[in-house]
Amino acid sequence: MNEFERVRAYLTDLQDRICAAIEAADGQARFQEDLWQRAEGGGGRTRVLRDGAVFEQAGIGFSDVAGSRLPPSASANRPELAGASWRATGVSLVFHPLNPYVPTTHANVRFFQAQRDGEVVASWFGGGFDLTPFYPFDEDVQHWHRVARDLCAPFGDERYAAHKRWCDEYFFLRHRNETRGVGGLFFDDLHGDFERDFDYLRAVGDGFLDAYLPIVQQRKDTAYGEREREFQLYRRGRYVEFNLVYDRGTLFGLQSGGRSESILMSLPPRVRWEYGFNPEAGSAEARLADYLVPRDWL
């Protein structure tokens, strides 16, 4: 297999493994699969689990798509590639748990190639994972970052610090002056050594469940009431704001004529906004603000 096909094979297997693990953790609902084709080239398989015992909605999509001209969002940092044809493959997921004490999470791993006259002129990896709690626990956040740090260790002493910082900077809502959550890892435009970079992509993809599932198991049976549920729905609004205003993956998908249903799968099934909402001073809800700033968790 060529490089692209090797990455593609890994990603389809990763989607299968994550789906199996999430179904087992939920214990009730199953993923429904939607196979789709893209007119300009390629397609994918979108899988969504709804109304489970643990997950209100969990979406995970695989795609392998191509186009004749890079959209502006993809060539903004690489102007020399403007107008090149392209092919991209990736797995992207967002899980929205029902229990407000279980954090929302997002992960993405992807590979991109730009071509001119049928020849690959550039290729790179991107991805990461991040965590968005509503009622955070220090031990959960520390576990999350410990897994991230440990999977980065074989790739150099600076890898975790650099990609954690990139995550903090990327998942930041400037109009709210807060991070989307407690961070994790984020990277883009990783190139130069295909085998080493592919190893890192696999470490991130394979490490996601190690980081997330123990938190799910720890919090999924925590008792909650209407107050916690209402706060969860309110904070989900921040997720919507980020994805529709800032997220490059969303913008790329929409600009490249992607499949809207799959692109917007990341949005929560239920959400609310409230004008002028301020949590009660000293409350668990007010405490969340202390976590929405970049911090060294380890």
Curated annotation (Swiss-Prot):
What does the record give as its pathway?
Porphyrin-containing compound metabolism; protoporphyrin-IX biosynthesis; protoporphyrinogen-IX from coproporphyrinogen-III (O2 route): step 1/1
Subcellular localization(s) per the UniProt record: Cytoplasm
Necessary cofactors: a divalent metal cation
Q: Which GO terms describe its cellular component?
A: cytoplasm
* Protein keywords: Cytoplasm, Heme biosynthesis, Metal-binding, Oxidoreductase, Porphyrin biosynthesis
- SUPFAM superfamilies documented for this protein: Coproporphyrinogen III oxidase (SSF102886)
> Where a divalent metal cation is bound, by residue?
H96, H106, H145, H175
Q: Which residues bind substrate?
A: S92, N108, V109, R110, G257, G258, R259
Documented EC number(s): 1.3.3.3
In terms of superkingdom, the source organism counts as Bacteria
Q: Where is this region: Important for dimerization?
A: 239-274
Under catalytic activity, the entry for this protein gives: coproporphyrinogen III + O2 + 2 H(+) = protoporphyrinogen IX + 2 CO2 + 2 H2O
Pfam families assigned:
Coprogen_oxidas
| Entries under Gene3D superfamilies matching the protein | Coproporphyrinogen III oxidase, aerobic
What class does this enzyme belong to in the EC scheme? oxidoreductase
Active site, per annotation: H106
Give the main location. Answer: cytoplasm
GO biological process terms held by the UniProt record: protoporphyrinogen IX biosynthetic process
Name one molecular function that GO assigns to this entry.
metal ion binding
In this UniProt entry, which residues are annotated as the site Important for dimerization? H175
Give the UniProt family note.
Belongs to the aerobic coproporphyrinogen-III oxidase family.
- Complexes and interactors: Homodimer.
What does the record give as the function of this protein? Involved in the heme biosynthesis. Catalyzes the aerobic oxidative decarboxylation of propionate groups of rings A and B of coproporphyrinogen-III to yield the vinyl groups in protoporphyrinogen-IX.
Report what the protein is called.
Oxygen-dependent coproporphyrinogen-III oxidase
Organism, as annotated:
Stenotrophomonas maltophilia (strain R551-3)
Q: Which gene encodes it?
A: hemF
